């Protein structure tokens, strides 16, 4: 069953009467990479963090439908929320690795949602999970790095570990919050290519918040433009002409 995500009337206010997200409506269905672009402060990261409930939405619906069932992520609580989060992989801008742990140990944290507290504390993981972790290290180009500490890796290597860790969850939906912002241009291309490939291989939608419009055009089959907490564009890269980019970014100086 193909994964679908339907966001309806999503509002997030950090202060009453000042919404960061102001009535977001968005449907994501099937595999493919969707890029979210827009100026800083327009709510791109807030949107992704609402989807996987790192922050609480103020109102609205976030309905995830996949092979495991249907759940409104905006309303679910307790153990049901923990189970729902297992279905969503997250790749972070600043990697969010445990620096003192090895690459392998960081990957295995992606299975904590499926592991008892005692086994997690004792670092006892299913042999099948360990085998999959080695396979994913090969997939992301880090074969032979299993025993290296995370704090010894470059930024690009850390982001590859972050992607592999997210894939360890066997997610039905993959979110990536500014995955290339701290990387050089060559590595940024490699990371976007990897995200696109893994979305296709695993048959899941990938939702990426990104500042680089050209990377979005190159790798996304769909681009969502946000401005002022609203969706102002939803289409492919061909529709992102100078007029639309001015609508999204509120000026032309960025083009110079």
From Swiss-Prot:
Membrane topology: Peripheral membrane protein
Protein origin, superkingdom: Bacteria
Catalytic activity reported: phosphonate(out) + ATP + H2O = phosphonate(in) + ADP + phosphate + H(+)
The protein's role, per its UniProt record: Part of the ABC transporter complex PhnCDE involved in phosphonates import. Responsible for energy coupling to the transport system.
A GO term from the CC aspect: plasma membrane
Protein name, UniProt field: Phosphonates import ATP-binding protein PhnC
Binding residues annotated for ATP, in chain numbering: 38-45
GO molecular function, one term: ATP hydrolysis activity
Localization terms from the record: Cell inner membrane
The entry's keywords: ATP-binding, Cell inner membrane, Cell membrane, Membrane, Nucleotide-binding, Phosphonate transport, Translocase, Transport
Enzyme Commission numbers on file: 7.3.2.2
Domain ABC transporter: 5-253
Keyword set includes Kinase: no
Family indicated by similarity: Belongs to the ABC transporter superfamily. Phosphonates importer (TC 3.A.1.9.1) family.
Keyword field contains Membrane: yes
Subunit structure: The complex is composed of two ATP-binding proteins (PhnC), two transmembrane proteins (PhnE) and a solute-binding protein (PhnD).
Primary location group: membrane
One Pfam family, short name: ABC_tran
PANTHER family from the UniProt entry: AMINO ACID IMPORT ATP-BINDING PROTEIN, PHOSPHONATES IMPORT ATP-BINDING PROTEIN PHNC
Originating gene: phnC
């Amino acid at each position: 069953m193909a994964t679908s995500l339907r966001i309806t009337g999503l509002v997030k206010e950090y202060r009453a009467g000042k919404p960061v997200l102001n009535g977001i409506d968005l449907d994501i269905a099937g595999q493919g990479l969707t890029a979210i672009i827009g100026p800083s402060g327009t709510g791109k990261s807030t949107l992704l963090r609402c989807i996987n409930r790192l922050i609480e939405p103020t109102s609205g619906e976030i309905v995830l439908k996949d092979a495991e069932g249907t759940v409104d992520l905006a309303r679910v609580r307790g153990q049901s929320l923990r189970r729902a989060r297992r279905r969503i992989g997250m790749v972070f801008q600043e990697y969010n690795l445990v620096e003192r742990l090895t690459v392998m140990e960081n990957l295995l944290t992606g299975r904590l949602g499926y592991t008892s507290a005692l086994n997690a504390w004792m670092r006892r993981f299913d042999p099948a999970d360990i085998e999959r972790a080695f396979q994913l290290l090969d997939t992301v180009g880090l074969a032979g790095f299993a025993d290296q500490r995370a704090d010894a890796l470059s930024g690009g290597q850390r982001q590859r570990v972050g992607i592999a860790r997210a894939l360890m969850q066997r997610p039905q939906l993959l979110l990536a919050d500014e995955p290339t912002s701290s990387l050089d241009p060559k590595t940024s291309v490699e990371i976007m290519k990897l995200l696109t490939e893994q979305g296709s291989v695993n048959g899941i939608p990938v939702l990426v918040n990104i500042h680089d419009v050209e990377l979005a055009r190159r790798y996304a089959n769909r681009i969502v433009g946000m401005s002022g907490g609203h969706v102002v564009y939803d289409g492919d890269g061909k529709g992102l002409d100078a007029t639309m980019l001015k609508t999204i970014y509120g000026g032309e100086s960025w083009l110079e």
